[in-house]
Amino acid sequence: MSKIIGIDLGTTNSCVAIMDGDKVKVIENAEGDRTTPSIIAYTDDNETLVGQSAKRQAVTNPHNTLYAIKRLIGRRFEDDVVQKDIKMVPYKIAKADNGDAWVEVKGQKMAPPQVSAEVLKKMKKTAEDYLGEKVTEAVITVPAYFNDSQRQATKDAGKIAGLEVKRIINEPTAAALAYGLDKKSGDRTVAVYDLGGGTFDLSIIEIADVDGEHQFEVLATNGDTFLGGEDFDLKVIEYLADQFKKDSGIDLRGDSLAMQRLKEAAEKAKIELSSSQQTDVNLPYITADASGPKHMNVKLTRAKLESLVEDLVQRSLEPCKVALQDAGMKAGEIDEVILVGGQTRMPLVQEKVKEFFGKEPRKDVNPDEAVAMGAAIQGAVLSGDVKDVLLLDVTPLTLGIETMGGVATPLIEKNTTIPTKKSQIFSTADDNQTAVTIHVVQGERKQAAQNKSLGRFDLADIPPAPRGVPQIEVTFDIDANGILNVSAKDKATGKEQSIVIKASSGLNDDEIEKMVRDAEANAEEDRKFEELVQARNQGDAMVHAVRKTLSEAGDKVSDSEKESIEAAIKDLEEALEGSDKEAIEAKTQKLTEVSSELAQKMYADQADQAQQAGGQEEGQAKSADDAVDAEFEEVKDDDKK
């Protein structure tokens, strides 16, 4: 049986590893390097270059050289971060027919998974050359904070590259696997700080020995899918362009060739300043004007670089706080801090992490290779070559459905261990409702509209019944890759509908981190909204109950009584249209008072009838007491296709 390889598909660099006996081996590519730049170029003679060869010709071919494609994977063209990316890169980002963000090269549109597949193909070939046999299966890593669409798109890239993706695993978890496998002693809690080329993750992971088995349990994860080395480079590029404009009066930002040279120089300067205090950026013939050629010569000190990127490093500490809070831990309770991702080589990053956790981060983990090594270990676990490892990962955001009054009712809370399956019974909002729309949302806000809509589907042909009677079982099922399936079943008829959340409806990165931040900042607003919805639901239920009692009472109620009840109903219905909680509560109370006499009369009549019937109906009232009222849109037959 061929080996399952482990691939770290990175924003800036990628890496491939395998389990060789009981040791993990990172495989060198054809150029002799252990990592490969995630850069793809399309040349004039229709050749596709991947890795170092693509990087070398980027300066002369900026429009057809694609890098940081991982930032576009599984995203919509209209996403804020994609719009931000358009201004940052020399290649063209185009809108696909389905609204996704694609790239355009030589007049041809290409999907990000298609481009990423070229990098995966090179990783596959690297492994095949080393093993001397065909490779068809892989474990591929993704940032822990990747959403459903991004995970799906990564799987698609693997498929395009001719790989069966056996598992998608989170990068920090993979790094913890690589770190923890050869450390035999005792239980410990580690924080994996993963600052890569394009994304940032922080995971808190408990490593324990359970009956001779290494158990890796993720307690909490948080992150920012648009924060990484590319952003650090951009700060340096901006600074160099500003300095040049100040010195020569020429703005290089419109010159893609010059900007590509600046990008290369900025990355090189940033790397040099991790080991030296000062570097020179020398770029002869960067541009020219009427007076002749212009050269760039800028001195850049480590202190200057640190002042340029300090806000980015600071931004990475926010998810650290949230993850600790979610895990119910203090920074001092973390036993080890592991740094992953090339950007963690920067002294300022190491210093801030040390300051935050109060301990020196470990230096015995290779930040560029640990993730691929962890993926290879997971591959060996799946193929049965490694038997004493159990990996328990989590879903990063709360998943639920929209219920009555626009509330997001959670089914699976964030940081729930996956795979997981959860069901809950919901019901109809109106009498004789024959169809419901299940609206799936993802995020931390109480109001469904404030969260991200992942998809909708209809469950039709529900037998007509009073509201609250039908029992609709909604089931959320997250697989080990973190990919979601949702189904709804009418328990009376057994009729079922389901949906796999498709890549075209994913979240964008800003929204994800914003959701968690907003949830904290808007806790008060959410509380008021919940109270308003509660008042509305009580008012609604009161109107429904009184109307029903009125129609059952028939001529037992006098005209004057009927008039005052109808007037109170009208007042309450008007109040329900607005957003004044106090007014709704007052009108509900008024309706309760004017209808109480009628209710007592009806109750007395029923008591008499019940006595005569000998109480035979006892116990039949237990219908769907456990059902949660849910406001589903009724699906009209003529809307159906």
Curated annotation (Swiss-Prot):
- Cysteine disulfide partners in this protein: none
Please give the residue positions where the record annotates the modification Phosphothreonine. Answer: 199
The induction field says: By stress conditions e.g. heat shock.
Q: Which InterPro entries match?
A: ATPase_NBD, Chaperone_DnaK, Heat_shock_70_CS, HSP70_C_sf, HSP70_peptide-bd_sf, Hsp_70_fam
Per UniProt, which keywords does this protein have?
A: ATP-binding, Chaperone, Nucleotide-binding, Phosphoprotein, Stress response
Identify the PROSITE patterns for this entry: HSP70_1 (PS00297), HSP70_2 (PS00329), HSP70_3 (PS01036)
Q: What's this chain's function?
A: Acts as a chaperone.
HAMAP family documented for this protein = DnaK
Q: Which family does it belong to?
A: Belongs to the heat shock protein 70 family.
Q: Which NCBIfam families match?
A: PRK00290.1, PRK05183.1, prok_dnaK
The name under which this protein is listed is: Chaperone protein DnaK
The species this protein belongs to is Marinobacter nauticus (strain ATCC 700491 / DSM 11845 / VT8)
The gene name reads dnaK
